[in-house]
Amino acid sequence: TVGGVWAKLDVGIENAAELDGAGKWQTFRFITFPMLRGATTSAAVLVFLYCVTSFGIILLLGAGKVSSIETEIYFSLTQFLDFKTASAYALVQTVITVLAFAISKRIGNGEAGVETPTEIETSSGLNRREWPVVVVSVIFVIGVLVLPILNLLAKFTWAGFQSLSGNGQRGLLNISVWQATGNSLRNIVIAAGLALLIGILVSWLLSRSKRSWLEIPFLLPMGISSVVLGFGYLLSIRAGWLTVPLVQALLATPLVIRIVHPALVSLGTDYRDVAVTAGANGWQIWRLVEAPMLSSVLRSAAVFAALVSLGEFGAASLLSYGDQATLPVVLYQLIGRPGPENYSMAMAACAMLIVFVFAISMTSALVQTRRRSS
């Protein structure tokens, strides 16, 4: 959000301020940041929603001592079968989400931006005053992301990998990890496909409408947690393997909209007017003009949708039963039960999940690099 809007700012204004004697900090404080206030507010609301709807992290690291609205909903359903309490918590969480979106729309104007290949300019490089910020950022990323991943990979064993075809120590799992992986891959195809289809259609409609409030209903699933959505599906549709990818598609659709819609708006309307004058209809304009121009953006949206489906745990923990368990659900079951075999299988499953994420991300990056070089 912030990066996309920042990339579109007029650099000439900052250069003019520096020529007048303003330093880097003064330029950022009085010129750059006021122009980024809307995007910063939207990003802050998004971070808040991700924190307040966090489920898997609280469940794993909280160790029963730390709870959230999401974990209370989960335990009310799975341990006490208390649907009334779970419904009350779900209502509170939904109200928080609606209020957060209202604040974002009121203060931040819902501003968002996505960098497209045509907007990326070659930088003149970093100067000495900017290097400390870069170093601190790199250290932070290494500390909170890279080191834990490397620690997981270091504990991977071949024996644990070979055990993935089994059901764990004392028959813990209903299905093998490989079967759960197959379920996750199937869900990725369905969820990412539906999210991309719905997200593109909604983005296309929003780009042709001047009513910005129409975007809010489609973005609500971004703030409403997967546990609440899974609970809703559990009450209305009941069990069934298709409910999991449907919820995952619903969760991924707002991300697709947030990526595709700003990119569509940034294209302007000149090309559309020319195409209409030439006799093209809406479908032809999208297929022959807009889609080719947004190919990299659509690819990024597909990657995000696939990653959301792959790592989704909240709804799957409520809706995936028996032989329909997904990879994150099986991983949680292995981590939650003691035993050397379960532990080694959990480390192997973690490594496999990391490889999947890396492969999906790198495939998109390689395709985009080849297109740029050609």
Where are these regions (language model features)?
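Membrane-interfacial helix termini and adjacent extracytoplasmic/periplasmic loops
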Residues: 25, 58-65, 119-121, 166, ...
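Cytoplasmic-entry segments and transmembrane alpha-helices of multi-pass inner-membrane transporters
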Residues: 14, 38, 126-136, 201-233, ...
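Hydrophobic positions within alpha-helical transmembrane segments of bacterial inner-membrane proteins
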Residues: 39-55, 98, 102, 188, ...
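Interhelical loop and adjacent transmembrane-helix boundary motif
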Residues: 58-98, 155-175, 310, 316-366
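N-terminal signal-anchor/first transmembrane alpha helix
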Residues: 94, 98-101, 123-151, 212-218
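C-terminal transmembrane helix and the adjacent membrane-cytosol boundary/short C-terminal tail
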Residues: 3-14, 18, 25-26, 57, ...
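Membrane-embedded alpha-helices of multi-pass transport/permease systems
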Residues: 1-13, 52-56, 103, 146-150, ...
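Transmembrane alpha-helices
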Residues: 1-6, 10-11, 24-53, 135-143, ...
